[in-house]
Swiss-Prot record:
It comes from Jannaschia sp. (strain CCS1). Pathway: Lipid metabolism; fatty acid biosynthesis. Its main location: cytoplasm. Belongs to the acyl carrier protein (ACP) family. Residues 2-77 form the Carrier domain. Keywords: Cytoplasm, Fatty acid biosynthesis, Fatty acid metabolism, Lipid biosynthesis, Lipid metabolism, Phosphopantetheine, Phosphoprotein. GO terms for biological process: lipid A biosynthetic process. One of its GO terms (molecular function) is acyl binding. GO terms for cellular component: cytosol; membrane. 4'-phosphopantetheine is transferred from CoA to a specific serine of apo-ACP by AcpS. This modification is essential for activity because fatty acids are bound in thioester linkage to the sulfhydryl of the prosthetic group. The modification O-(pantetheine 4'-phosphoryl)serine is found at S37. Carrier of the growing fatty acid chain in fatty acid biosynthesis. This is Acyl carrier protein. It comes from the Bacteria.
Length: 77
């Protein structure tokens, strides 16, 4: 697992209080990990802070899974 993926996973586990084993590339924040819309906004803000990037609103709407988040952040770095 890349450093970025490990850091994203840590944020997801801490913010959503889920088991690390459930955080896989295809895991939907809402459908699989129990997040609501506020949780997803907080995740995006945490990603921005952790990685020193800005995620525009239109891009944030496309980040639905752990894999989406990791891919977006990797490309934004």
């Amino acid at each position: 697992m890349s450093d970025i993926a490990a850091r994203v996973k840590k944020i997801v586990v801490e913010h959503l209080n889920v088991d690390e084993d459930k955080v896989v590339d295809s895991a939907s924040f809402i459908d699989d990990l129990g997040a609501d819309s506020l949780d997803t906004v907080e995740l995006v803000m945490a990603f921005e802070e952790e990685f020193g990037i800005e995620i525009p609103d239109d891009a944030a709407e496309t980040i639905q899974t752990f894999g989406d988040a990791t891919k977006f952040i990797s490309e934004a770095q």
